[in-house]
């Protein structure tokens, strides 16, 4: 919801949004934007993904094409949209798309990156907002854990700050109510990586 509020600039409500990339974030974001009365245009390369987005979000205009193609972006009215959000899986593509949108005078330009070392370069290029799903998720987890600690609801023993304050490590105390108590780590149902 805070993300939607950030689309407003100087009391001018954004009425249209371009999203380049048709992944899961786009799916949920486009649904929120459409439900908020914002016109959404999605550009995605994968035809199957385009079909799915057309079926699930019929209110959005879904264009099957290359979001790095400036001729396509111009033909679809990029310069006249209120905001452009680059959500492809490639940081470099997102950077190029966002720089082009800023060059074309788009009011709000938001770029998704996975490698935070690009954040300063992107900001220097005149791009409004940089988002990192991994960083956002990590912050939400830390916020949740800290709230558990402050409410006395968790069994957090120690919070360590490591790697020059760039990472946090939590030490928990296992109680009889702890899920998977006594189960070796090798047998826990963990996701890869």
PLM region spans:
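Cytosolic regulatory regions of ion transport systems
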Residues: 1-193
């Amino acid at each position: 919801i805070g993300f939607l509020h950030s689309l407003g600039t100087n009391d001018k409500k954004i009425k249209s949004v371009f999203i380049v990339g048709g992944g899961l974030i786009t799916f949920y974001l486009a649904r929120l934007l459409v439900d908020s009365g914002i016109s959404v245009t999605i550009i995605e390369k994968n035809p199957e993904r385009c079909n799915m987005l057309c079926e699930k979000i019929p209110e959005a205009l879904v264009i099957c094409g290359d979001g790095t193609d400036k001729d396509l972006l111009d033909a679809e009215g990029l310069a006249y949209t209120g905001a452009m959000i680059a959500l492809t899986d490639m940081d470099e593509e997102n950077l190029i798309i966002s720089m082009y949108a800023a060059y074309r005078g788009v009011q709000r330009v938001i770029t998704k990156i996975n490698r935070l070392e690009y954040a300063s370069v992107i900001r220097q290029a005149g791009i409004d907002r940089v988002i990192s799903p991994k960083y956002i998720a990590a912050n939400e987890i830390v916020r949740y854990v800290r709230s558990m600690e402050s409410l006395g609801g968790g069994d957090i023993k120690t919070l360590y700050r490591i790697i020059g304050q760039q990472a946090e490590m939590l030490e928990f105390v296992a109680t009889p109510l702890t899920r998977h108590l006594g189960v070796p780590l090798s047998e826990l149902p963990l996701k890869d990586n």
